[in-house]
Curated annotation (Swiss-Prot):
Oligomeric and partner information: The 4 large subunits of the cytochrome b6-f complex are cytochrome b6, subunit IV (17 kDa polypeptide, petD), cytochrome f and the Rieske protein, while the 4 small subunits are petG, petL, petM and petN. The complex functions as a dimer.
Entry membrane topology: Multi-pass membrane protein
Thylakoid keyword on record: yes
Membrane-spanning residues: 36-56, 95-115, 131-151
Species lineage: Eukaryota, Viridiplantae, Streptophyta, Embryophyta, Tracheophyta
Subcellular localization, as worded in the UniProt entry: Plastid, Chloroplast thylakoid membrane
PROSITE patterns: CYTB_CTER (PS51003)
Presence of the UniProt keyword RNA-binding in the record: no
Task of the protein: Component of the cytochrome b6-f complex, which mediates electron transfer between photosystem II (PSII) and photosystem I (PSI), cyclic electron flow around PSI, and state transitions.
Name of the protein this chain belongs to: Cytochrome b6-f complex subunit 4
Family note: Belongs to the cytochrome b family. PetD subfamily.
Keywords: Chloroplast, Electron transport, Membrane, Photosynthesis, Plastid, Thylakoid, Transmembrane, Transmembrane helix, Transport
Amino acid sequence: MGVTKKPDLNDPVLRAKLAKGMGHNYYGEPAWPNDLLYIFPVVILGTIACNVGLAVLEPSMIGEPADPFATPLEILPEWYFFPVFQILRTVPNKLLGVLLMVSVPTGLLTVPFLENVNKFQNPFRRPVATTVFLIGTAVALWLGIGATLPIEKSLTLGLF
């Protein structure tokens, strides 16, 4: 290894190179050819191999044939719609239920404006956002679990 001297920022040649945009920090490995030719194909082929392996080892079984004349007792949506379904099911006025559904993303959009400390990403330094997240998660779980129960026990989850 040779001896490297510290760059002199008063050197006109170096200042001209820096003015042109040269002198950026080049840390790590270049993306071409290391990532694009070697790492990405390995990841893509590994993902394909996992999918094929799961399809061969655990094929999805075909269930019983659909009967268009037999309706289930209670029709439930997919699991990720359970909280919204519970809101629509328990609120007597459907317009109010739709307004409650619209208020959720609207409320989430207002959280950054409530707490004007955007320079902090640590959740312990953003108590309002952390509290809104925790309460929202608890309410979503409560509504989601309640949607799987009969309407009489849905809000109390059968606990009270």
